[in-house]
Swiss-Prot record:
Mapped Sequence repeat ranges: 161-164, 165-168, 169-172, 173-176, 177-180, 181-184, 185-188, 189-192, 193-196, 197-200, 201-204, 205-208, 209-212, 213-216, 217-220, 221-224, 225-228, 229-232, 233-236, 237-240
Cellular localization per UniProt: Host cytoplasm
Keyword annotations: Host cytoplasm, Late protein, Repeat
Protein family according to the UniProt entry: Belongs to the asfivirus B602L family.
Job description of the protein: Plays an essential role in the assembly of the icosahedral capsid of the virus. Allows the assembly of 3 molecules of hexon protein p72 and formation of a thermostable trimer.
Region (20 X 4 AA tandem repeats of [CNS]-[ATV]-[DNS]-T): 161-240
UniProt keyword Repeat, yes or no: yes
Taxonomic path: Viruses, Varidnaviria, Bamfordvirae, Nucleocytoviricota, Pokkesviricetes
GO cellular component terms, A-Z: host cell cytoplasm
Organism: African swine fever virus (isolate Tick/South Africa/Pretoriuskop Pr4/1996)
Induction record: Expressed in the late phase of the viral replicative cycle.
Coarse class of the protein's main subcellular location: host cell
Protein's name according to its UniProt entry: Protein B602L
Length: 570
Protein backbone atom coordinates (compact mmCIF):
# COMPACT_ATOMS: atom_id res chain seq x y z
CA UNK A 1 0.00 0.00 0.00
CA UNK A 2 1.44 3.36 -1.06
CA UNK A 3 2.05 5.97 1.60
CA UNK A 4 -0.97 8.25 1.97
CA UNK A 5 -0.26 11.95 1.30
CA UNK A 6 -3.24 14.16 2.11
CA UNK A 7 -1.56 17.31 0.75
CA UNK A 8 -1.02 15.72 -2.63
CA UNK A 9 -4.61 14.45 -2.70
CA UNK A 10 -5.95 17.93 -1.91
CA UNK A 11 -3.79 19.45 -4.63
CA UNK A 12 -5.06 16.97 -7.25
CA UNK A 13 -8.70 17.60 -6.28
CA UNK A 14 -8.29 21.35 -6.58
CA UNK A 15 -6.57 21.08 -9.95
CA UNK A 16 -9.04 18.58 -11.39
CA UNK A 17 -12.30 18.36 -9.40
CA UNK A 18 -13.75 15.78 -11.79
CA UNK A 19 -11.04 13.22 -11.05
CA UNK A 20 -12.40 10.02 -9.49
CA UNK A 21 -10.95 8.94 -6.17
CA UNK A 22 -10.44 5.23 -5.57
CA UNK A 23 -12.15 3.39 -2.73
CA UNK A 24 -8.74 2.62 -1.20
CA UNK A 25 -7.88 6.32 -1.08
CA UNK A 26 -11.27 7.21 0.39
CA UNK A 27 -10.80 4.53 3.04
CA UNK A 28 -7.41 5.96 4.03
CA UNK A 29 -8.84 9.48 4.07
CA UNK A 30 -11.68 8.30 6.31
CA UNK A 31 -9.22 6.74 8.72
CA UNK A 32 -7.19 9.96 8.89
CA UNK A 33 -10.18 12.22 9.48
CA UNK A 34 -11.84 9.87 11.98
CA UNK A 35 -9.22 7.44 13.34
CA UNK A 36 -11.32 6.36 16.32
CA UNK A 37 -14.56 5.39 14.61
CA UNK A 38 -17.84 5.99 16.44
CA UNK A 39 -20.82 4.19 14.95
CA UNK A 40 -24.07 5.17 16.65
CA UNK A 41 -25.11 7.01 19.77
CA UNK A 42 -26.62 4.39 22.06
CA UNK A 43 -28.37 5.10 25.36
CA UNK A 44 -27.03 1.87 26.88
CA UNK A 45 -24.15 2.10 29.32
CA UNK A 46 -21.50 -0.53 30.04
CA UNK A 47 -19.86 -0.43 33.46
CA UNK A 48 -16.24 -1.62 33.41
CA UNK A 49 -13.35 -2.10 35.80
CA UNK A 50 -9.78 -1.91 34.55
CA UNK A 51 -6.62 -3.11 36.23
CA UNK A 52 -3.27 -2.37 34.64
CA UNK A 53 -1.66 -5.78 35.12
CA UNK A 54 1.09 -5.08 32.59
CA UNK A 55 2.35 -2.18 34.68
CA UNK A 56 2.59 -4.44 37.72
CA UNK A 57 4.50 -7.06 35.73
CA UNK A 58 6.93 -4.49 34.32
CA UNK A 59 7.63 -3.17 37.81
CA UNK A 60 8.46 -6.66 39.01
CA UNK A 61 10.58 -7.34 35.93
CA UNK A 62 12.49 -4.12 36.53
CA UNK A 63 12.93 -5.02 40.19
CA UNK A 64 14.29 -8.46 39.25
CA UNK A 65 16.74 -7.00 36.74
CA UNK A 66 17.77 -4.25 39.16
CA UNK A 67 18.49 -6.72 41.97
CA UNK A 68 20.51 -8.93 39.63
CA UNK A 69 22.49 -5.91 38.45
CA UNK A 70 23.38 -4.47 41.86
CA UNK A 71 24.50 -7.82 43.28
CA UNK A 72 26.53 -8.54 40.14
CA UNK A 73 28.04 -5.05 40.26
CA UNK A 74 28.99 -5.63 43.91
CA UNK A 75 30.87 -8.81 42.94
CA UNK A 76 32.88 -6.94 40.30
CA UNK A 77 33.37 -3.74 42.28
CA UNK A 78 36.86 -2.78 43.46
CA UNK A 79 36.79 0.19 45.87
CA UNK A 80 39.25 3.03 45.40
CA UNK A 81 40.95 4.83 48.28
CA UNK A 82 42.73 8.14 48.71
CA UNK A 83 46.23 6.68 48.73
CA UNK A 84 47.70 5.14 45.54
CA UNK A 85 46.91 1.48 45.04
CA UNK A 86 48.93 -1.18 43.26
CA UNK A 87 47.15 -2.29 40.13
CA UNK A 88 48.18 -5.48 38.37
CA UNK A 89 50.11 -3.53 35.73
CA UNK A 90 52.10 -1.39 38.17
CA UNK A 91 52.73 -4.36 40.47
CA UNK A 92 54.21 -6.41 37.61
CA UNK A 93 56.32 -3.45 36.52
CA UNK A 94 57.81 -3.04 39.99
CA UNK A 95 58.49 -6.77 40.35
CA UNK A 96 60.23 -6.86 36.93
CA UNK A 97 62.42 -3.95 38.03
CA UNK A 98 63.32 -5.81 41.21
CA UNK A 99 64.14 -8.99 39.29
CA UNK A 100 66.41 -7.04 36.91
CA UNK A 101 68.13 -5.46 39.90
CA UNK A 102 68.76 -8.86 41.46
CA UNK A 103 70.23 -10.14 38.19
CA UNK A 104 72.75 -7.32 38.14
CA UNK A 105 74.07 -8.42 41.55
CA UNK A 106 75.57 -5.04 42.27
CA UNK A 107 76.55 -3.77 45.69
CA UNK A 108 74.47 -0.63 45.14
CA UNK A 109 71.18 -2.47 45.89
CA UNK A 110 71.34 -4.34 49.20
CA UNK A 111 69.32 -7.56 49.34
CA UNK A 112 67.57 -6.34 52.49
CA UNK A 113 66.21 -3.32 50.63
CA UNK A 114 64.86 -5.54 47.87
CA UNK A 115 63.14 -7.84 50.35
CA UNK A 116 61.63 -4.91 52.24
CA UNK A 117 60.28 -3.45 49.00
CA UNK A 118 58.63 -6.76 48.06
CA UNK A 119 57.15 -7.09 51.54
CA UNK A 120 55.87 -3.52 51.38
CA UNK A 121 54.11 -4.21 48.09
CA UNK A 122 52.63 -7.44 49.47
CA UNK A 123 51.41 -5.69 52.64
CA UNK A 124 49.85 -2.92 50.55
CA UNK A 125 48.00 -5.46 48.41
CA UNK A 126 46.90 -7.38 51.52
CA UNK A 127 45.60 -4.21 53.17
CA UNK A 128 43.77 -3.21 50.01
CA UNK A 129 42.18 -6.66 49.73
CA UNK A 130 41.08 -6.59 53.37
CA UNK A 131 39.52 -3.14 52.98
CA UNK A 132 37.79 -4.31 49.83
CA UNK A 133 36.31 -7.31 51.65
CA UNK A 134 35.11 -5.14 54.53
CA UNK A 135 33.49 -2.63 52.16
CA UNK A 136 31.81 -5.38 50.14
CA UNK A 137 30.54 -7.05 53.33
CA UNK A 138 28.97 -3.78 54.48
CA UNK A 139 27.32 -3.14 51.10
CA UNK A 140 26.16 -6.76 50.84
CA UNK A 141 24.51 -6.43 54.25
CA UNK A 142 22.74 -3.26 53.11
CA UNK A 143 21.53 -4.84 49.85
CA UNK A 144 20.24 -7.96 51.58
CA UNK A 145 18.30 -5.83 54.06
CA UNK A 146 16.41 -4.23 51.17
CA UNK A 147 16.38 -6.89 48.44
CA UNK A 148 16.47 -10.34 50.11
CA UNK A 149 13.53 -11.46 52.24
CA UNK A 150 14.31 -12.09 55.92
CA UNK A 151 11.40 -13.18 58.15
CA UNK A 152 13.03 -11.45 61.12
CA UNK A 153 13.01 -8.07 59.35
CA UNK A 154 10.24 -8.09 56.78
CA UNK A 155 6.51 -8.70 56.85
CA UNK A 156 6.14 -10.94 53.80
CA UNK A 157 8.11 -12.37 50.89
CA UNK A 158 7.29 -11.07 47.41
CA UNK A 159 7.12 -14.70 46.23
CA UNK A 160 3.63 -16.07 46.89
CA UNK A 161 3.34 -19.03 44.49
CA UNK A 162 4.98 -21.54 46.84
CA UNK A 163 1.78 -23.32 47.83
CA UNK A 164 -0.09 -22.91 44.55
CA UNK A 165 1.33 -25.91 42.75
CA UNK A 166 0.86 -28.19 45.74
CA UNK A 167 -2.72 -27.16 46.35
CA UNK A 168 -3.79 -27.48 42.72
CA UNK A 169 -1.78 -30.60 41.94
CA UNK A 170 -4.29 -33.11 43.26
CA UNK A 171 -7.25 -31.47 41.52
CA UNK A 172 -5.50 -30.97 38.19
CA UNK A 173 -3.69 -34.30 38.09
CA UNK A 174 -6.85 -36.32 37.53
CA UNK A 175 -7.82 -34.37 34.42
CA UNK A 176 -4.22 -34.41 33.20
CA UNK A 177 -3.94 -38.18 33.50
CA UNK A 178 -7.34 -38.76 31.92
CA UNK A 179 -6.38 -37.07 28.65
CA UNK A 180 -2.81 -38.37 28.51
CA UNK A 181 -1.90 -40.90 25.82
CA UNK A 182 -0.59 -43.97 27.61
CA UNK A 183 1.85 -44.94 24.88
CA UNK A 184 3.29 -41.42 24.72
CA UNK A 185 3.73 -41.21 28.48
CA UNK A 186 5.38 -44.61 28.61
CA UNK A 187 7.92 -43.75 25.91
CA UNK A 188 8.54 -40.26 27.27
CA UNK A 189 9.32 -41.36 30.82
CA UNK A 190 10.81 -44.77 30.10
CA UNK A 191 13.93 -43.95 32.08
CA UNK A 192 12.07 -42.64 35.14
CA UNK A 193 12.76 -44.49 38.38
CA UNK A 194 9.40 -46.21 38.81
CA UNK A 195 9.89 -47.24 42.42
CA UNK A 196 10.85 -43.76 43.56
CA UNK A 197 8.02 -42.13 41.64
CA UNK A 198 5.45 -44.59 42.93
CA UNK A 199 6.50 -44.00 46.54
CA UNK A 200 6.55 -40.23 46.13
CA UNK A 201 3.28 -39.76 44.25
CA UNK A 202 1.22 -42.69 45.51
CA UNK A 203 -1.28 -40.52 47.33
CA UNK A 204 -1.63 -38.11 44.40
CA UNK A 205 -2.05 -40.61 41.56
CA UNK A 206 -3.74 -43.52 43.33
CA UNK A 207 -7.31 -42.76 42.34
CA UNK A 208 -6.36 -41.40 38.91
CA UNK A 209 -4.17 -44.31 37.89
CA UNK A 210 -6.69 -46.81 39.23
CA UNK A 211 -9.39 -45.62 36.84
CA UNK A 212 -6.91 -45.19 33.98
CA UNK A 213 -5.43 -48.64 34.46
CA UNK A 214 -8.88 -50.21 34.69
CA UNK A 215 -9.80 -48.97 31.23
CA UNK A 216 -6.36 -49.88 29.91
CA UNK A 217 -6.45 -53.44 31.24
CA UNK A 218 -9.86 -54.10 29.73
CA UNK A 219 -8.36 -54.41 26.25
CA UNK A 220 -4.82 -55.38 27.21
CA UNK A 221 -3.10 -58.68 27.88
CA UNK A 222 -3.17 -59.32 31.63
CA UNK A 223 0.56 -60.03 31.77
CA UNK A 224 1.46 -56.60 30.35
CA UNK A 225 -1.22 -54.65 32.20
CA UNK A 226 0.81 -54.11 35.39
CA UNK A 227 3.87 -52.84 33.52
CA UNK A 228 1.76 -50.44 31.45
CA UNK A 229 0.00 -48.99 34.49
CA UNK A 230 3.24 -48.50 36.44
CA UNK A 231 4.92 -46.69 33.55
CA UNK A 232 1.83 -44.53 33.05
CA UNK A 233 1.81 -43.47 36.70
CA UNK A 234 5.56 -42.81 36.64
CA UNK A 235 5.23 -40.67 33.52
CA UNK A 236 2.42 -38.56 34.96
CA UNK A 237 4.23 -37.92 38.23
CA UNK A 238 7.54 -37.10 36.53
CA UNK A 239 5.96 -34.45 34.34
CA UNK A 240 4.37 -32.66 37.32
CA UNK A 241 7.85 -32.01 38.76
CA UNK A 242 8.84 -29.52 36.07
CA UNK A 243 5.66 -27.47 35.67
CA UNK A 244 3.08 -25.55 37.63
CA UNK A 245 -0.08 -27.50 36.85
CA UNK A 246 -2.25 -24.40 37.19
CA UNK A 247 0.05 -22.44 34.82
CA UNK A 248 2.01 -24.93 32.63
CA UNK A 249 4.12 -22.20 31.00
CA UNK A 250 5.61 -21.17 34.35
CA UNK A 251 8.76 -22.90 35.60
CA UNK A 252 8.36 -23.57 39.37
CA UNK A 253 10.77 -21.61 41.56
CA UNK A 254 12.28 -24.72 43.18
CA UNK A 255 13.31 -25.94 39.71
CA UNK A 256 14.80 -22.55 38.81
CA UNK A 257 16.86 -22.34 42.01
CA UNK A 258 18.64 -25.68 41.84
CA UNK A 259 21.22 -27.17 39.50
CA UNK A 260 19.54 -29.84 37.39
CA UNK A 261 21.17 -33.11 36.42
CA UNK A 262 20.75 -33.50 32.67
CA UNK A 263 19.40 -36.97 31.80
CA UNK A 264 21.78 -39.05 29.67
CA UNK A 265 19.27 -39.37 26.82
CA UNK A 266 18.99 -35.55 26.60
CA UNK A 267 22.68 -34.69 27.02
CA UNK A 268 23.58 -34.79 23.31
CA UNK A 269 20.62 -32.62 22.30
CA UNK A 270 21.23 -30.13 25.14
CA UNK A 271 24.92 -29.79 24.15
CA UNK A 272 23.99 -29.12 20.53
CA UNK A 273 21.33 -26.53 21.41
CA UNK A 274 23.50 -24.61 23.90
CA UNK A 275 26.66 -24.71 21.79
CA UNK A 276 25.98 -21.22 20.42
CA UNK A 277 23.94 -18.27 21.75
CA UNK A 278 21.90 -18.29 18.54
CA UNK A 279 20.95 -21.93 18.99
CA UNK A 280 20.03 -21.42 22.62
CA UNK A 281 17.84 -18.38 21.89
CA UNK A 282 16.15 -20.17 18.99
CA UNK A 283 15.33 -23.21 21.12
CA UNK A 284 14.09 -21.03 23.98
CA UNK A 285 11.88 -19.09 21.55
CA UNK A 286 10.40 -22.31 20.17
CA UNK A 287 9.61 -23.59 23.65
CA UNK A 288 7.79 -20.35 24.47
CA UNK A 289 5.66 -20.54 21.31
CA UNK A 290 3.54 -23.67 21.19
CA UNK A 291 2.74 -23.28 17.49
CA UNK A 292 6.44 -23.81 16.63
CA UNK A 293 6.82 -27.13 18.46
CA UNK A 294 6.17 -29.15 15.29
CA UNK A 295 9.54 -27.98 13.92
CA UNK A 296 11.49 -29.67 16.71
CA UNK A 297 10.66 -33.36 17.05
CA UNK A 298 12.50 -34.10 20.28
CA UNK A 299 11.15 -31.01 22.02
CA UNK A 300 7.63 -31.85 20.87
CA UNK A 301 7.87 -35.29 22.48
CA UNK A 302 8.86 -33.95 25.89
CA UNK A 303 9.02 -30.12 26.03
CA UNK A 304 8.70 -29.94 29.83
CA UNK A 305 11.98 -31.81 30.26
CA UNK A 306 13.85 -29.40 27.96
CA UNK A 307 12.44 -26.07 29.08
CA UNK A 308 13.59 -26.01 32.75
CA UNK A 309 17.03 -27.30 31.76
CA UNK A 310 17.54 -24.64 29.09
CA UNK A 311 16.35 -21.81 31.31
CA UNK A 312 18.15 -23.15 34.38
CA UNK A 313 21.38 -21.22 33.78
CA UNK A 314 23.76 -19.70 36.30
CA UNK A 315 22.14 -16.31 35.74
CA UNK A 316 18.56 -17.51 36.33
CA UNK A 317 19.64 -19.49 39.40
CA UNK A 318 21.43 -16.41 40.71
CA UNK A 319 18.39 -14.19 40.09
CA UNK A 320 15.92 -16.67 41.62
CA UNK A 321 18.01 -16.94 44.80
CA UNK A 322 17.59 -13.21 45.56
CA UNK A 323 13.86 -12.85 46.28
CA UNK A 324 13.11 -9.34 47.55
CA UNK A 325 10.82 -8.69 50.51
CA UNK A 326 7.36 -7.27 49.90
CA UNK A 327 8.50 -4.32 52.03
CA UNK A 328 10.74 -3.12 49.18
CA UNK A 329 7.84 -3.09 46.71
CA UNK A 330 5.74 -1.13 49.20
CA UNK A 331 8.51 1.42 49.87
CA UNK A 332 9.24 1.71 46.15
CA UNK A 333 5.56 2.32 45.33
CA UNK A 334 5.32 4.86 48.16
CA UNK A 335 8.39 6.68 46.83
CA UNK A 336 6.90 6.80 43.32
CA UNK A 337 3.52 8.05 44.55
CA UNK A 338 5.09 10.67 46.83
CA UNK A 339 7.42 12.01 44.11
CA UNK A 340 5.29 11.23 41.08
CA UNK A 341 5.22 14.70 39.48
CA UNK A 342 8.98 15.19 39.97
CA UNK A 343 9.74 11.74 38.54
CA UNK A 344 7.48 12.38 35.57
CA UNK A 345 9.10 15.76 34.85
CA UNK A 346 12.61 14.31 35.11
CA UNK A 347 11.73 11.33 32.90
CA UNK A 348 10.23 13.54 30.18
CA UNK A 349 13.34 15.72 30.33
CA UNK A 350 15.78 12.83 30.01
CA UNK A 351 13.96 10.57 27.54
CA UNK A 352 11.95 11.30 24.38
CA UNK A 353 9.02 9.03 25.33
CA UNK A 354 5.76 10.48 26.63
CA UNK A 355 3.88 8.97 29.59
CA UNK A 356 1.16 6.47 28.73
CA UNK A 357 -0.64 6.37 32.01
CA UNK A 358 -4.25 7.05 30.99
CA UNK A 359 -6.48 4.92 28.77
CA UNK A 360 -9.41 5.89 26.56
CA UNK A 361 -11.71 3.25 25.13
CA UNK A 362 -15.01 3.08 23.27
CA UNK A 363 -17.65 0.34 23.16
CA UNK A 364 -18.84 -0.07 19.57
CA UNK A 365 -21.59 -2.65 19.98
CA UNK A 366 -22.77 -5.64 21.97
CA UNK A 367 -22.89 -8.99 20.18
CA UNK A 368 -24.02 -12.38 21.45
CA UNK A 369 -20.73 -14.07 22.35
CA UNK A 370 -22.20 -17.54 21.83
CA UNK A 371 -22.53 -16.79 18.11
CA UNK A 372 -18.90 -16.73 17.02
CA UNK A 373 -19.92 -16.08 13.41
CA UNK A 374 -21.49 -12.74 14.36
CA UNK A 375 -18.39 -11.77 16.32
CA UNK A 376 -16.18 -12.48 13.31
CA UNK A 377 -18.57 -10.71 10.93
CA UNK A 378 -18.49 -7.55 13.03
CA UNK A 379 -14.72 -7.53 13.15
CA UNK A 380 -14.13 -8.11 9.44
CA UNK A 381 -16.92 -5.68 8.47
CA UNK A 382 -15.47 -2.68 10.32
CA UNK A 383 -11.77 -3.50 10.65
CA UNK A 384 -10.85 -1.36 7.61
CA UNK A 385 -12.77 1.63 8.95
CA UNK A 386 -11.11 1.60 12.35
CA UNK A 387 -7.63 3.01 12.77
CA UNK A 388 -6.93 1.33 16.11
CA UNK A 389 -7.01 -2.36 17.01
CA UNK A 390 -10.32 -4.01 17.90
CA UNK A 391 -10.61 -5.97 21.15
CA UNK A 392 -13.49 -8.20 22.17
CA UNK A 393 -14.62 -8.05 25.80
CA UNK A 394 -16.66 -10.81 27.43
CA UNK A 395 -19.30 -9.17 29.63
CA UNK A 396 -19.35 -10.27 33.25
CA UNK A 397 -15.78 -11.62 33.21
CA UNK A 398 -12.34 -10.15 33.59
CA UNK A 399 -10.87 -9.86 30.10
CA UNK A 400 -7.28 -9.28 29.00
CA UNK A 401 -7.17 -6.57 26.34
CA UNK A 402 -5.10 -7.28 23.25
CA UNK A 403 -5.05 -7.30 19.48
CA UNK A 404 -8.11 -9.15 18.14
CA UNK A 405 -6.27 -10.49 15.12
CA UNK A 406 -2.66 -11.08 16.11
CA UNK A 407 -3.06 -12.26 19.70
CA UNK A 408 -6.59 -13.63 19.73
CA UNK A 409 -5.65 -17.23 20.50
CA UNK A 410 -3.20 -16.15 23.17
CA UNK A 411 -5.72 -14.00 25.03
CA UNK A 412 -8.46 -16.59 24.62
CA UNK A 413 -6.11 -19.08 26.30
CA UNK A 414 -5.67 -16.81 29.33
CA UNK A 415 -9.37 -15.90 29.43
CA UNK A 416 -10.39 -19.57 29.43
CA UNK A 417 -7.78 -20.61 32.01
CA UNK A 418 -9.27 -18.61 34.85
CA UNK A 419 -6.81 -20.00 37.41
CA UNK A 420 -4.00 -17.95 35.84
CA UNK A 421 -6.11 -14.77 35.86
CA UNK A 422 -7.29 -15.50 39.40
CA UNK A 423 -3.71 -15.87 40.61
CA UNK A 424 -2.71 -12.52 39.07
CA UNK A 425 -5.76 -10.65 40.40
CA UNK A 426 -5.45 -12.22 43.86
CA UNK A 427 -1.83 -11.11 43.99
CA UNK A 428 -2.82 -7.61 42.89
CA UNK A 429 -5.42 -7.48 45.68
CA UNK A 430 -2.90 -8.81 48.21
CA UNK A 431 -0.40 -6.09 47.24
CA UNK A 432 -3.00 -3.46 48.09
CA UNK A 433 -3.58 -4.96 51.56
CA UNK A 434 0.01 -5.63 52.60
CA UNK A 435 0.98 -1.94 52.96
CA UNK A 436 -0.60 -1.54 56.40
CA UNK A 437 1.09 -4.67 57.74
CA UNK A 438 4.49 -3.53 56.41
CA UNK A 439 4.07 -0.10 58.01
CA UNK A 440 2.96 -1.68 61.28
CA UNK A 441 5.97 -4.03 61.27
CA UNK A 442 8.34 -1.11 60.64
CA UNK A 443 6.85 0.99 63.46
CA UNK A 444 6.98 -1.98 65.85
CA UNK A 445 10.71 -2.54 65.27
CA UNK A 446 11.52 1.19 65.45
CA UNK A 447 9.58 1.55 68.71
CA UNK A 448 11.44 -1.43 70.17
CA UNK A 449 14.77 0.14 69.21
CA UNK A 450 13.66 3.48 70.70
CA UNK A 451 12.78 1.81 74.02
CA UNK A 452 16.15 0.03 74.09
CA UNK A 453 18.02 3.31 73.53
CA UNK A 454 15.98 5.83 75.57
CA UNK A 455 13.72 3.74 77.79
CA UNK A 456 9.90 3.68 78.04
CA UNK A 457 7.69 6.70 77.44
CA UNK A 458 7.27 9.25 80.22
CA UNK A 459 4.21 8.65 82.46
CA UNK A 460 2.62 11.91 81.33
CA UNK A 461 2.83 10.85 77.68
CA UNK A 462 1.22 7.50 78.47
CA UNK A 463 -1.70 9.26 80.19
CA UNK A 464 -2.09 11.62 77.22
CA UNK A 465 -2.09 8.72 74.75
CA UNK A 466 -4.66 6.79 76.77
CA UNK A 467 -6.94 9.85 76.70
CA UNK A 468 -6.59 10.94 73.07
CA UNK A 469 -5.51 7.71 71.39
CA UNK A 470 -7.69 6.66 68.46
CA UNK A 471 -7.61 3.81 65.95
CA UNK A 472 -6.81 6.15 63.07
CA UNK A 473 -3.37 7.17 61.92
CA UNK A 474 -0.02 5.63 62.79
CA UNK A 475 -0.79 5.40 66.52
CA UNK A 476 -3.64 3.03 65.78
CA UNK A 477 -1.31 0.51 64.16
CA UNK A 478 0.07 -0.64 67.55
CA UNK A 479 -2.26 -1.61 70.36
CA UNK A 480 -1.79 -0.52 73.97
CA UNK A 481 -1.04 -4.13 74.88
CA UNK A 482 1.79 -4.29 72.35
CA UNK A 483 3.27 -0.98 73.54
CA UNK A 484 2.95 -2.07 77.18
CA UNK A 485 4.67 -5.40 76.53
CA UNK A 486 7.45 -3.71 74.52
CA UNK A 487 8.15 -1.45 77.51
CA UNK A 488 7.90 -4.41 79.88
CA UNK A 489 10.48 -6.27 77.78
CA UNK A 490 12.74 -3.17 77.56
CA UNK A 491 12.50 -3.24 73.78
CA UNK A 492 13.38 -6.93 73.47
CA UNK A 493 11.11 -8.07 70.62
CA UNK A 494 11.44 -11.77 71.46
CA UNK A 495 10.29 -11.24 75.05
CA UNK A 496 7.58 -8.81 73.97
CA UNK A 497 6.14 -11.48 71.68
CA UNK A 498 6.17 -13.93 74.60
CA UNK A 499 4.32 -11.40 76.76
CA UNK A 500 1.71 -10.99 73.99
CA UNK A 501 1.24 -14.75 73.84
CA UNK A 502 1.01 -14.98 77.65
CA UNK A 503 -1.70 -12.29 77.68
CA UNK A 504 -3.66 -14.20 75.03
CA UNK A 505 -3.40 -17.45 77.01
CA UNK A 506 -4.48 -15.80 80.25
CA UNK A 507 -7.45 -14.17 78.50
CA UNK A 508 -8.51 -17.50 76.99
CA UNK A 509 -8.19 -19.28 80.36
CA UNK A 510 -10.22 -16.53 82.02
CA UNK A 511 -13.01 -16.90 79.46
CA UNK A 512 -13.14 -20.68 79.86
CA UNK A 513 -13.15 -20.56 83.67
CA UNK A 514 -16.01 -18.05 83.62
CA UNK A 515 -18.30 -20.72 82.18
CA UNK A 516 -20.27 -22.87 84.63
CA UNK A 517 -20.14 -26.11 82.64
CA UNK A 518 -17.43 -26.92 80.12
CA UNK A 519 -17.86 -29.28 77.22
CA UNK A 520 -15.25 -32.03 76.72
CA UNK A 521 -13.68 -29.98 73.91
CA UNK A 522 -13.53 -26.88 76.11
CA UNK A 523 -11.92 -28.87 78.94
CA UNK A 524 -9.27 -30.16 76.53
CA UNK A 525 -8.73 -26.61 75.28
CA UNK A 526 -8.33 -25.37 78.87
CA UNK A 527 -5.69 -28.02 79.67
CA UNK A 528 -3.86 -27.28 76.43
CA UNK A 529 -3.88 -23.51 77.03
CA UNK A 530 -2.54 -23.92 80.58
CA UNK A 531 0.37 -26.01 79.25
CA UNK A 532 1.08 -23.37 76.61
CA UNK A 533 1.04 -20.67 79.29
CA UNK A 534 3.54 -22.56 81.48
CA UNK A 535 5.84 -23.12 78.49
CA UNK A 536 5.66 -19.44 77.57
CA UNK A 537 6.55 -18.40 81.13
CA UNK A 538 9.55 -20.74 81.04
CA UNK A 539 10.66 -19.35 77.66
CA UNK A 540 10.98 -15.88 79.19
CA UNK A 541 14.07 -17.11 81.06
CA UNK A 542 15.80 -18.36 77.90
CA UNK A 543 18.59 -15.93 76.85
CA UNK A 544 18.47 -14.55 73.31
CA UNK A 545 21.71 -16.24 72.25
CA UNK A 546 20.73 -19.74 73.42
CA UNK A 547 18.29 -22.49 72.46
CA UNK A 548 16.35 -24.41 75.07
CA UNK A 549 16.24 -28.21 74.77
CA UNK A 550 13.82 -30.24 76.93
CA UNK A 551 15.24 -33.61 78.04
CA UNK A 552 13.20 -36.39 79.70
CA UNK A 553 15.11 -38.74 82.01
CA UNK A 554 14.00 -41.88 83.84
CA UNK A 555 14.35 -41.33 87.59
CA UNK A 556 13.22 -44.42 89.53
CA UNK A 557 10.66 -45.35 86.88
CA UNK A 558 9.40 -41.78 86.81
CA UNK A 559 9.95 -39.41 83.90
CA UNK A 560 11.32 -36.04 84.89
CA UNK A 561 12.05 -33.09 82.63
CA UNK A 562 15.48 -31.50 82.55
CA UNK A 563 16.26 -28.33 80.65
CA UNK A 564 19.48 -27.87 78.68
CA UNK A 565 20.69 -24.77 76.85
CA UNK A 566 22.86 -24.71 73.75
CA UNK A 567 24.56 -21.83 71.98
CA UNK A 568 22.53 -20.41 69.09
CA UNK A 569 24.11 -19.40 65.78
CA UNK A 570 23.22 -15.73 65.27
Amino acid sequence: MAEFNIDELLKNVLENPSTEISEETLKQLYQRTNPYKQFKNDSRVAFCSFTNLREQYIRRLIMTSFIGYVFKALQEWMPSYSKPTHTTKTLLSELITLVDTLKQETNDVPSESVVNTILSIADSCKTQTQKSKEAKTTIDSFLREHFVFDPNLHAQSAYTCADTNASTSADTNASTCADTNVDTCASTCADTNVDTCADTCASTCASTCASTCASTCADTNVDTCADTCVSTCASTCANTEYADLADPERIPLHIMQKTLNVPNELQADIDAITQTPQGYRAAAHILQNIELHQSIKHMLENPRAFKPILFNTKITRYLSQHIPPQDTFYKWNYYIEDNYEELRAATESIYPEKPDLEFAFIIYDVVDSSNQQKVDEFYYKYKDQIFSEVSSIQLGNWTLLGSFKANRERYNYFNQNNEIIKRILDRHEEDLKIGKEILRNTIYHKKAKNIQETGPDAPGLSIYNSTFHTDSGIKGLLSFKELKNLEKASGNIKKAREYDFIDDCEEKIKQLLSKENLTPDEESELIKTKKQLNNALEMLNVPDDTIRVDMWVNNNNKLEKEILYTKAEL
